[in-house]
Amino acid sequence: MTEQNEELKKKLTPLQYEVTQNNGTEPPFRNEYYDLEAEGIYVDIVSGKPLFSSKDKYDAGCGWPSFTKPIDEEEVIEKEDRSHGMFRTEVRSKQADSHLGHVFPDGPGPNGLRYCINSAALRFIPKADLEKEGYGKYKALFD
């Protein structure tokens, strides 16, 4: 195991590590953010890069946080995923290469996409804490 992996194992919970580093999936409806309605942004649990906004979050009924789009499409990578006998599109964070979840073509809105993301891959920054946490420029998303 590399030194970087050892550091991540210390930093992350076992579930966060399994999801982000081993392409795991947390249980639906039993995760931290699937029903969170507070305003704020969701950042990569590994790198801290802003990924999704509560403005683009909606209840898809699937049991995981669902978003219509990322804050910045340049910060996510989409890859073909044929695991488990399915054809899906995996979503990974660009900077940390963390497994985030999958994107499906069954969402609402103009792009018709549903980013189905594991809570364990994210950290939520409430709108009130954006400045304090170093994400002040994202307050404009909520004006």
UniProtKB/Swiss-Prot annotation:
| Active site positions, chain numbering | 116 (nucleophile)
GO cellular component assignments: cytoplasm
User: For this chain's UniProt record, which GO biological process terms are given?
Assistant: protein repair; response to oxidative stress
Q: Which GO MF term does the entry hold, naming one?
A: peptide-methionine (R)-S-oxide reductase activity
Tell me its EC number(s), please: 1.8.4.12
What EC class is this? Answer: oxidoreductase
Q: Which catalysed reactions does the entry list for this protein?
A: L-methionyl-[protein] + [thioredoxin]-disulfide + H2O = L-methionyl-(R)-S-oxide-[protein] + [thioredoxin]-dithiol
Could you list this entry's UniProt keywords, alphabetically sorted.
Answer: Oxidoreductase
Its domain of life reads Bacteria
Q: What is this protein called?
A: Peptide methionine sulfoxide reductase MsrB
Which organism's genome codes for this protein? Halalkalibacterium halodurans (strain ATCC BAA-125 / DSM 18197 / FERM 7344 / JCM 9153 / C-125) (Bacillus halodurans)
Query: Top-down, what is the taxonomic lineage of the species of origin?
Result: Bacteria, Bacillati, Bacillota, Bacilli, Bacillales
